[in-house]
């Protein structure tokens, strides 16, 4: 198995497209592993529909996966594999992963590793100071706004309770904070 190693590079730096695998296991966590596959035209077309291109995906550590395996809380092993009709994408964090399966009728989201509490997406990419910050309902909205040069973050869901200290910190950094949640059910 090859280790996936994150290196902080400028978005314009060349990016390796080798297939890579990561395996994580700690005593207090369920083990998980995944295999990264290069973005192909079909995978990029899914994101392009939302105005999101590969540079934005790379900047936010979004990867396409060939497979993901873990075990349930009861200890039962499972593996899911990407297909042309059911791709698997991963939001890779430090010590955790959030799996997104946009076309899956069930299990659209899976989690591995030690998820931070509270979980947030996009916090590392926003500037220390700015005019407007959008808080959205999900990662795809963050990616789309960022691809169009807006600052955005999200928490795990639209129903997540955002800690007061985070709101206060963001208020010191941005002149305007706009909640931009979906109106669908």
Describe every region a protein language model picked out.
Residues 3, 41, 118, 142, ...:
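Short linear motifs in intrinsically disordered/low-complexity regions
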Residues 2-88, 92, 123-131:
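TOPRIM metal-binding catalytic domain and adjacent DNA-binding surface shared by DnaG-type primases
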Residues 39, 49, 157, 169-185:
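Acidic, divalent-metal-binding catalytic cores of TOPRIM
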Residues 68-176:
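Phosphate-handling DNA/RNA-contact segment within nucleic-acid enzymes
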């Amino acid at each position: 198995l090859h280790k996936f190693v994150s290196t902080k590079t400028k978005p314009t730096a060349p990016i390796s497209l080798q297939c890579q695998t990561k395996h994580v296991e700690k005593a207090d966590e369920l083990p998980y592993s995944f295999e990264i596959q290069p973005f192909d035209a079909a995978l990029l077309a899914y994101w392009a529909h939302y105005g999101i291109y590969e540079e934005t995906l790379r900047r936010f550590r979004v990867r396409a996966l060939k497979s993901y395996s873990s075990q349930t809380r009861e200890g039962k092993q499972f593996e899911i594999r990407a297909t042309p009709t059911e791709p698997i994408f991963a939001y890779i964090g430090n010590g955790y992963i959030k799996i997104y399966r946009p076309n899956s009728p069930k299990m659209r989201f899976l989690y591995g590793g030690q998820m931070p509490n509270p979980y947030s997406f996009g916090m590392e990419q926003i500037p220390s100071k700015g005019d407007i910050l959008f808080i959205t309902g999900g990662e795809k909205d963050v990616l789309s706004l960022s691809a169009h040069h807006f600052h955005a973050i999200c928490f795990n869901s639209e129903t997540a309770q955002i800690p007061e200290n985070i709101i206060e910190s963001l208020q010191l950094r941005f002149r305007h904070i706009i909640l931009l949640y979906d109106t669908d059910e």
